[in-house]
């Protein structure tokens, strides 16, 4: 499968899971906890995979997509974003599930993630599609 499409598919999953959390009653802490665990695991695995496979290759072939000056800038910014998402994700776990403070922390994580997804889709993925062959995109 094309790595850029795989990344986009995972982005859609992340957005859907955040939306599902928003639609669950605060009293249903079991469902909220299960969804949050699933989402947090996806966020962590997604960031780790991008840092291990996608961004190292982008650094070699990219030139900067759209409003990014270089592939190095895209990569550096993405890793900073991933760290911000990790930190805001960890902050969620410091609050009682279903509490107002828990939902606020989930919202902060959602914002950090949403900002990152938009930037990555506009910059890194565009840059990669322009410079990687379809074969390479499938091999990764």
Regions found by a protein language model. Give the residues of each.
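Small-residue-biased structural context
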Residues: 1-140
């Amino acid at each position: 499968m094309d790595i850029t499409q795989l990344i986009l598919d995972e982005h859609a999953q992340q957005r859907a899971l955040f939306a599902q959390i928003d639609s669950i009653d605060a009293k249903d802490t079991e469902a909220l906890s299960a969804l949050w665990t699933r989402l947090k695991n996806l966020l962590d695995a997604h960031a780790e995979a991008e840092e291990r496979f996608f961004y190292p290759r982008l650094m070699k072939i990219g030139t900067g997509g759209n409003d990014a000056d270089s592939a190095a800038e895209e990569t550096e910014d993405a890793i900073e974003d991933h760290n911000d998402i990790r930190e805001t994700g960890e902050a969620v776990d410091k609050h009682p599930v279903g509490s107002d403070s828990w939902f606020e922390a989930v919202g902060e994580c959602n914002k950090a993630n949403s900002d990152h997804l938009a930037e990555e889709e506009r910059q890194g993925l565009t840059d990669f599609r322009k410079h990687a062959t379809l074969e390479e995109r499938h091999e990764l």
